[in-house]
Each structure stands twice: as C-alpha cells, then as structure tokens.
Amino acid sequence: MGLVPLDSEEPPMDMERIINRVTDKQHLGPDAQVDDKALVFVPSDPALTDPFLALVEDWFSKPGFEWHPHRGLETVTTVVDGVLEHGDNLGHAGALEPGEVQWMTAGRGIIHRELAYRDEHAHVLQMWLNLPAAKKLTPSRYQDLTRAAMPRIETPGVRIDVHAGTVDGVTGAADTHHPVQGLVATLDPESSYTLQVPPEHRLFAYVMNGRLLIAGRELHAGRTGWSDPVESPAPTTLHLMATDPDHPARVMIYSGTPLREPVALGGPFVMNTKDEIAQAFTDFHGGTFGPVPRTARLAYDR
C-alpha cells in the first residue's frame, strides 16, 4: 500500500441535514377578514424559529386585509391560488397571480392592504421574516417577484421556483437584508431532489400538498419540518423525495441565518424592546407612517 502525501487532503464531504422537530398546522376557520385561516407556525418561542417569525395560510374573498401598519419586519406573501391585489401608502400597487410573491420590507413604517382581486378569491401563504436590529428602521420597500422575474430549476420530475438566495447556481430575484434562501418545489410522484443549505442556516420545510420524505422523515400536507444550524466546514444537504405513488408533492422551504437578538412583538410591529413597540404605536397614531390612502380598487390589466 502506497503512502498518501500529507498535502493531498480531500475536501470535506457535505453533511446531511436532519429534522430536529415537526410542527402541525393549526386550523382556525373563518373570521371577520377571511373565509378560512390556518397558522402554519407562530412565534410562541422565537428562538426556535429565528429568523422566521410566523407563517399563516389565508383564504379570502371579501373583505381581506384592509389598510393596516407594519414596522420592523418583512412580510413575504406567496400566492397559492387566485389573484392578490395589494397597495401601500407609498404609492405602490399591483396584483399577483398564483406562484408569484410579494416581498415587503416594512422597515421604519408602512401602511398597506391585501385584497382578493374583485373580491373573487385569494389563497395565500404569508411569512413574517424578522429584520436585524440595525435594519429595523430601514426605508420601506416592495419587491414583486412575478413569474417573468422568477427563475425556475427543472430536473426530471422536479420544478423549483427560487424566491431568494442561490439554489444550484440559480439566484432568486429577492434582495434580502440578511442571508435567506427560499423556494417552492413541486415533485412528481416518487421523484427526488437534494438541496444544498448553508450550515449556519435554520431551515423550515412546509408541506403544502402531498407526502414527502424530508431528511429521512415522512411528512404529509400541513406539517412543517425544522432543521437547526450545524457546525460543518462544508455545505449541508437536505434530501427530498415524494412518497405518494399517485400524487405530486409541493413544499415551501426557507432557510436563513438566525439573528440571535431579542424579539418584542406588538400587534403588527416587531422590534427588540417593549419601549420600541410603544414608540411604534405612538408614531403610527401620530401620523409618522403617513396618511391612510383613500385610493380606488385596481384596474387589473396584467
């Protein structure tokens, strides 16, 4: 047996991710704003979901979500079905179709609304993404990730819409304030895919439809698998396989670097201290966020 030169070290192999815990969607039913609502996850313990705060699934026709404020976070809204009409008090307005995403940075303060176009129907998933303390009061902005601007990865039996970050060399259109990778993947029956994930990221995988084997754990629609950051000199991988022989599976997967900062929650505001929450309410009621618009509904012409 020959000697191996000391300087011929092979690069470290990718580490396979595990699912550390699983959470179940909580169905709430209709309320004054929506026809139906479910909480995919909520910030009962923000340290376990950091940097993600909440993921809510809504089905609505009328009234939807009329004018309301936000500060200190980003909302990432994926249209599952129907058409979502949106607008804000900075003059932005638009309408998004199935598969498209609205990435709104509330930052220092914004007033916006989200409605079903023509009061017909909208089915959306809205995630609340925390902002670092240094970016809590960053200027507000909108990013509409339309089909035309959204890159897609296609391999045999797999279609992946990349929202943010870089997946297999394909970079999503969202400009993010801290490292985040996000996608929605559709896998045909018994198809599989291996996703590379930065080791420092916390990851969630929400099964929207069907059944999936995720990192060796089978999850069905309505369940979310969580994978915590790991120490590894190489990228980590998450293996996916659609296990239902008759139906495809669809999954939303987001990962991001935990902020590891205090979280203070107050209605539509997310800051680092209770005093900052109180200031947000004072600023909103004092008009600092600007006036509530009185604009007419959109003329949807896409």
Each model region followed by its residue ranges:
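Jelly-roll (double-stranded beta-helix
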Residues: 1-302
